């Protein structure tokens, strides 16, 4: 976990749009050491009278998972995502099937099918599945059928392998959750759907008509939050908002309580844990052997149960208070970045998006993966340790995960022993490509983490964010209206009270940022502004009409979004960049660096470079300032800015 050391020049809370200063990073490994009493080595004939003295304790031997390295080699390891693809609207759901398909669903009711290939994925088909919001999606245990339910009171059923819609059910109520509850070999392809406002569960034939085969009307008394099939033991687990968890079966066993579990009364289990904590499961999944049941609760705790006994096996606390305490004990992120991520977490709770966060097992059942504010955590369930965090430095809040492991099946001749033993380089190149496909909060993209880091991110030709969607009519109209007379330029001169600074601008890479700067400059907005924050050996900052570091706005009023470009980095001194108070909060303030500041990449928009007048920038950076506020004792101001 990254930590950034502060300094006297670290941004203070009262300032809104200050760039962060350099820091250090280190990995934290907080692990509880469990002590056990040491046995007495000597037995004295004389007994102690009264209480015994405190005995020494020995550290308990750490558990080790055999072949852990082999298992981890079959999981994604890259710290940054390799590729991302688009929908028109925010992506809310993603699943991966055993038939090597990845299916994504967005808020506007659209569903896309993607095929996993030897390296990466390829687009297959696009469906307008629902007229409204998609509430839930599910894929069958063998990967043959897929269904989705939406607030248009309909269920759509798809044949995954042939990527075709094969059935449509009119439900007559607003659905909440759905799940395929049949196993391979069953006569009926049964699917369960819950009513969003009640605890009712309706069972249908996925290939049949609208008439339910069975209705559970007394199993749950509150709206359901999850329905999941355990295909190994042919049992279904459902949960509701009151924290109750129920086991039941499908049509082959007449919808009764499963007989293959090792308990009869729920009081013999730990399944009341959620009700005790006044929480409920927002995600449920099973290990490949069916023996472990992993959940994420509304209280942000990860609980892992033994399925057959219902006993609690592990609890991992991922609550905001835990992260705050961790940050105070040992800094995990720079203060500004930590504050930004905490704000995102609170917004998650405010809009009830926590229910979309899920948890998945790997193919061995020894590891669970889920998204947190620090990135995707990979937890070893056997040793109780976090072995890997993916995407910690990315500017996304990971929500739903789907994990692909193994080698994508391709229509080719079967591999023979002779082919395996041969030294054919083409055959040897066929390797596993473990991939995590994940959605992000308020993003219309899904992201792919693999074992490969992004290709040269400084090359403009290798953009990892694929633009696979055409712009909407509104975006085209906005772009057309914005053209009009030329409002931007590629150079300008900042006339200051200590001399002139010539700058080159990048209107192609950062059109909105350069337009904001040029229009403000032409309108005389920056005239008389002081350099209100100067840090020797770091940067000079200006553009605030109030001179406090808390003012300023864009030419459109308010704030506008970041414009990061792979070729524009803080990799050299005299870089012109936007100051902000977090992601997408650009106004009018900007700064010029006097040293390379790579830690500001992808946090502040670079939109220009100084081409002449570097000595003026250096003189300004060396003026005497108040050590507490970084404000110069004698004002250094902008006279005006000439845009060429």
UniProtKB/Swiss-Prot annotation:
Give the record's free-text account of how this protein's activity is regulated: Inhibited by cyclosporin A (CsA).
SMART domains xref list: WD40
What EC numbers are recorded for this enzyme? 5.2.1.8
Q: Which SUPFAM superfamilies match?
A: Cyclophilin-like, WD40 repeat-like
Q: Which GO terms describe its biological process?
A: mRNA processing; protein folding; RNA splicing
Listed under catalytic activity are:
[protein]-peptidylproline (omega=180) = [protein]-peptidylproline (omega=0)
Q: Where is this region: Disordered?
A: 1-48
Task: Keyword check for RNA-binding, yes or no.
Answer: no
- WD repeat boundaries on the chain: 86-124, 129-168, 219-258, 276-317
Keyword Disulfide bond in record: no
Superkingdom of the organism of origin:
Eukaryota
State the Gene Ontology terms under molecular function. peptidyl-prolyl cis-trans isomerase activity
Localization annotation: Nucleus
Domain PPIase cyclophilin-type per the UniProt entry, residue ranges:
488-643
Matching entries from Pfam families are given as: Pro_isomerase, WD40
**Where does this protein chiefly localize?**
nucleus
Basic and acidic residues composition bias: which ranges?
17-29
Q: Which UniProt keywords apply?
A: Acetylation, Isomerase, mRNA processing, mRNA splicing, Nucleus, Repeat, Rotamase, Spliceosome, WD repeat
For this UniProt entry, what's an example GO CC term? Answer: catalytic step 2 spliceosome
What the entry lists under InterPro entries is as follows:
Cyclophilin-like_dom_sf, Cyclophilin-type_PPIase_dom, Cyclophilin_A-like, WD40/YVTN_repeat-like_dom_sf, WD40_repeat_dom_sf, WD40_rpt
User: Which CDD domains does the UniProt entry name for this protein?
Assistant: cyclophilin_WD40 (cd01927)
**N-acetylalanine modification, residue list:** 2
- Name the protein family: Belongs to the cyclophilin-type PPIase family. PPIL1 subfamily.
Function, as annotated, reads: PPIase that catalyzes the cis-trans isomerization of proline imidic peptide bonds in oligopeptides and may therefore assist protein folding. May be involved in pre-mRNA splicing.
Relate the assembly described in the record: Identified in the spliceosome C complex.
Q: What is this protein called?
A: Peptidylprolyl isomerase domain and WD repeat-containing protein 1
């Amino acid at each position: 976990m990254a930590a950034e050391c502060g300094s006297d020049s670290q941004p203070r809370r009262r300032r809104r749009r200050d760039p962060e200063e350099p820091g250090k990073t280190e990995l934290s490994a907080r692990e509880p050491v469990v002590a056990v009493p040491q046995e007495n080595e000597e037995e004295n004939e004389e007994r102690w009278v009264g209480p015994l003295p405190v005995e020494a304790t020995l550290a308990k031997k750490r558990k080790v998972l055999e072949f852990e390295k082999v298992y981890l080699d079959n999981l994604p390891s890259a710290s940054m995502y390799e590729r991302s693809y688009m929908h028109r609207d925010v992506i809310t759901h993603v699943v991966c099937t055993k038939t090597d398909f990845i299916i994504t669903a967005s808020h506007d009711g659209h569903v896309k099918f993607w095929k996993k290939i030897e390296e990466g994925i390829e687009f297959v088909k696009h469906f307008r599945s629902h007229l409204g919001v998609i509430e839930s999606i599910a894929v069958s245990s063998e990967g043959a059928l897929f269904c989705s339910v939406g607030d248009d009171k309909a269920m759509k059923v798809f044949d995954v392998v042939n990527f075709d819609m094969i059935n449509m059910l009119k439900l007559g109520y607003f659905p909440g959750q759905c799940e395929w509850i049949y196993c391979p070999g069953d006569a009926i392809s049964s699917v369960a759907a819950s009513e969003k406002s009640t605890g009712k569960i309706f069972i249908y034939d996925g290939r049949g008509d609208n008439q339910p085969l069975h209705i559970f009307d007394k199993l749950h008394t509150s709206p359901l939050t999850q329905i999941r099939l355990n295909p190994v033991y042919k049992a279904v687990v459902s949960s509701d908002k009151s924290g109750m968890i129920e086991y039941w079966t499908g049509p082959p066993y007449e919808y009764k309580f499963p007989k293959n579990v090792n308990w009869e009364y729920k009081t013999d289990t730990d399944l009341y844990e959620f009700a005790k904590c006044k929480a409920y499961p927002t995600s449920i999944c099973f290990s490949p052997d069916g023996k472990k049941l992993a959940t994420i609760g509304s209280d942000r705790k990860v609980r892992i149960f033994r399925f057959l006994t219902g006993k609690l096996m592990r609890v991992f606390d991922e609550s905001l208070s835990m992260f705050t305490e961790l940050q105070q004990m040992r800094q995990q992120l720079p203060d500004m970045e930590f504050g930004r991520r905490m704000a995102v977490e609170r917004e998650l709770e405010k809009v009830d998006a926590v229910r979309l966060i899920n948890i998945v097992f790997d193919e061995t059942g020894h590891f669970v993966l889920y998204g947190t504010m620090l990135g995707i955590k990979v937890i070893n369930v056997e040793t109780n340790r976090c072995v890997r965090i993916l995407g910690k430095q990315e500017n996304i809040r990971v929500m739903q995960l789907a994990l692909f492991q193994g080698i994508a099946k391709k229509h080719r001749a079967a591999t023979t022993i002779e082919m395996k033993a041969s030294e054919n380089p083409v055959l040897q190149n066929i390797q596993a490509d473990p991939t995590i496909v994940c959605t992000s909060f308020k993003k219309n993209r899904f992201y792919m983490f693999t074992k490969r880091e992004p290709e040269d991110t400084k090359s403009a030709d290798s953009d990892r964010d694929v633009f696979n969607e055409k712009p909407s009519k509104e975006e085209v109209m906005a772009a057309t209206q914005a053209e009009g007379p030329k409002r931007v330029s590629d150079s300008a001169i900042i006339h200051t009270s200590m001399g002139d600074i010539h700058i080159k601008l990048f209107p192609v890479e950062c059109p909105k940022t350069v337009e904001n700067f040029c229009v403000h400059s032409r309108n005389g907005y920056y005239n008389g502004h002081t350099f209100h924050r100067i840090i020797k050996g770091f940067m000079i900052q200006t553009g605030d009409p109030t001179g406090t570091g808390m003012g300023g706005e864009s030419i459109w009023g308010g704030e506008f979004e970041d414009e990061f470009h792979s070729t524009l980095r803080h990799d050299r001194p005299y870089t012109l960049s936007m100051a902000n108070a977090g992601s997408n909060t650009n106004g009018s303030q900007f700064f010029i660096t006097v040293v390379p500041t790579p830690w500001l990449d992808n946090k502040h928009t670079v939109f220009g470079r100084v081409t002449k007048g570097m000595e003026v920038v250096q003189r300004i950076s060396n003026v005497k300032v108040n050590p507490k506020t970084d404000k110069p004792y004698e004002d250094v101001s902008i006279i005006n800015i000439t845009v060429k």
